[in-house]
UniProtKB/Swiss-Prot annotation:
Signal peptide segment: 1-20
Disulfide bonds, paired cysteine numbers: 42-110
Subunit annotation: Alpha-beta TR is a heterodimer composed of an alpha and beta chain; disulfide-linked. The alpha-beta TR is associated with the transmembrane signaling CD3 coreceptor proteins to form the TR-CD3 (TcR or TCR). The assembly of alpha-beta TR heterodimers with CD3 occurs in the endoplasmic reticulum where a single alpha-beta TR heterodimer associates with one CD3D-CD3E heterodimer, one CD3G-CD3E heterodimer and one CD247 homodimer forming a stable octameric structure. CD3D-CD3E and CD3G-CD3E heterodimers preferentially associate with TR alpha and TR beta chains, respectively.
Superkingdom assignment: Eukaryota
PROSITE patterns cross-referenced by the UniProt entry: IG_LIKE
Predominant cellular place of this UniProt entry's protein: membrane
Name of the featured protein: T cell receptor alpha variable 8-6
Domain Ig-like: 21-113
Gene3D superfamilies reported in the protein's UniProt record: Immunoglobulins
Intracellular or extracellular location(s): Cell membrane
GO CC field: T cell receptor complex
UniProt-listed GO biological process terms: adaptive immune response
Length: 113
């Protein structure tokens, strides 16, 4: 069984000191069997247009950009099989992978800008 860690914290960004945006990751740890699907949930709040990001930090490595939503298609895919879908009405940007592998063991961070 794999253990994908999703730090349970809230990231808050302030734009020009007048507008606040926040991200909430609801799952702190997500145990998954190898080759099983996984979904890491990310909800945000914002009163303005958003850019959304997923970062990954593998053991003993620095933070790396996994994927980002800037505009256009609501489905964003990464080169390693992960995807995230921007859902404006549900204010979510959940990260998914249909089949995880031991190499996916890491901490995953959602961010908004």
């Amino acid at each position: 069984m794999l253990l994908l860690l999703v730090p349970a914290f809230q990231v808050i960004f302030t734009l020009g000191g007048t507008r606040a945006q926040s991200v909430t990751q609801l799952d702190s740890q997500v145990p998954v069997f190898e080759e099983a699907p996984v979904e890491l949930r990310c909800n945000y709040s914002s009163s303005v247009s958003v850019y959304l990001f997923w970062y990954v930090q593998y053991p003993n490595q620095g933070l790396q950009l996994l994927l980002k939503y800037l505009s256009g298609s609501t489905l964003v895919e990464s080169i390693n099989g992960f995807e995230a879908e921007f859902n404006k009405s549900q204010t979510s940007f959940h990260l998914r992978k249909p089949s995880v592998h031991i190499s996916d063991t890491a901490e995953y961070f959602c961010a908004v800008s």
